[in-house]
Amino acid sequence: MGILRDLSEADAEHTVVVAAFDHPARAELTTLDTLCAGNGVRWLPLRRERGRVIAGPAIAPGGIDFADVVARRRAASRELHTLDAIPPALGPGDLRWVLANVATHLERWLSGGRTAITTGEIELNPAELTEIRRPVLPVPDRARAVSAPASLIDDRTGIVTGLREIPPSPGMPARLRVCQADVADMRRVTNWPNDREAVGAAWHDFDLARQAAIDEAVKRYCGSWLAPDREVRFSSYEQLARYGVPALDPRRLKLYSAERYRSPGFPFAPLKTDSDCSWVEGFSHTTGEAVWVPAFLVSRERQAGEARFADPLPAGLATGTSAEQAVTSGLEEALAGDPTTLWWTGMPRLARLPIPDGIRSLIADTADGHEVTLIPLDNEFDVPAIAAAVFDRVARRLSLGFAVRPDALEAAKEALAEGFALHHTYRALDDERGLSALRREHGDLKPYRADRRYLDSYRDDFADVTDPLCLHQIRLDPRAGGRVAARLRNLPDRAWDDLPALGERRLKAYQDRVEARGFEVISVDLTTCDVAAAGHHVAHTLVPGLVSPLPRT
């Protein structure tokens, strides 16, 4: 078709432009998008790409636009620079089938009926007579309203672009199902260094592992970025208090010791009441009111010249299908992080739990190669917190999983799944090519060492440990795992009957325990507009006064 140059005379209420091309035509369609938007005209793109015919999305003023399509496909693409081959012309029968499908969707749209082209694209394959519906979510730095929830999973336009099962490695429990999620690369379309992969695990059920991987991908996606329209205040606590702005008192936070701050080369400054920093609005579930919190607790973004006070707290970031579910899961992480850190840094010799039959059956095929220790982590909130230590006898690698759940046995299963799943991460870190790929995403990882002596690569005070992956790399060093593993042997026994229980997995149940000890529950909503459009919520939950497992703690 020829390119429209002028729509100034068009009757916007009764005009719909259908733009058809026999190639991807992204530049032409982008130009047309601007023209139609400027004149308030609705339009429908129709193009061929990879031998398929792609119709949609149906574009109306104030809604989805073609820039969303370009951004989503660019971020999700695995072959960013691949040229699209020129497809053969459609035969008469194929063309009739395509036009009949497009006409049906077009008529539905114009008559106000339900059709997939109002929320995304339809990809038509004349050879197979199939139709694939692809969502086009809003791009977070260009927020817009959406008419209905859309999927966030799609290999061409999604946030999650792929899901695949990771088969069990030799010596790993066959009953543990592990799923890897591939995530769109938002660096291609905006200033957003999001994680490109996430892993989820579950016992027996791959659907649960798949959902765990999606949840992990979504929470990392939202947790790596603050939207440009997010209100951020740059001030000190004292200034905010002076103007009556409710804010979290820095003196309530437990970050680093005075000794660590004095350590030569330590990259962080202590946060004082007169320290200027960025603040974002959160919500206190304890008071029921808004409260401003230091932005660095939940985001890596800083203003020019802003001091560094800490990396974002690794515990507390979670997703859910409701805001309450996200906060509940985040609170479980925060409650697990506190006793975990106190145990890990102080290394008291705690008791161990006997392996119950229900768990022994899950790991029966790993008994020769792995040593499993379950440790209850007592805490002042009397919630079930379990650490699962998994020691690989052959590779001399130790992994640790932690979990809080209303029931101690469920917490143990969750922690054990995490502990075993981490060995997949270790294998990637211990592979020269795998590590090279990870270092492109996580620049603070050290270069590959065939001798695995990574303790020699990091500073003695671990001031250069800036990411949980750095901790995992250190644990590849047989000396690191060996030191801790020795502390896990010959522990006194403790009965399961002695452990606390919560009764139900609800926010109020946890919140009551936390507040009874004088602590406050705060959450910061980090849900991006595209994730919200897919029906998910992401929050970072904080409990001031608890210790979080900071990489350098």
Where are these regions (language model features)?
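A short, well-structured beta->alpha microelement
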Residues: 1-15, 27
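Short secondary-structure boundary/capping segments within folded domains
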Residues: 9-10, 34, 168-172
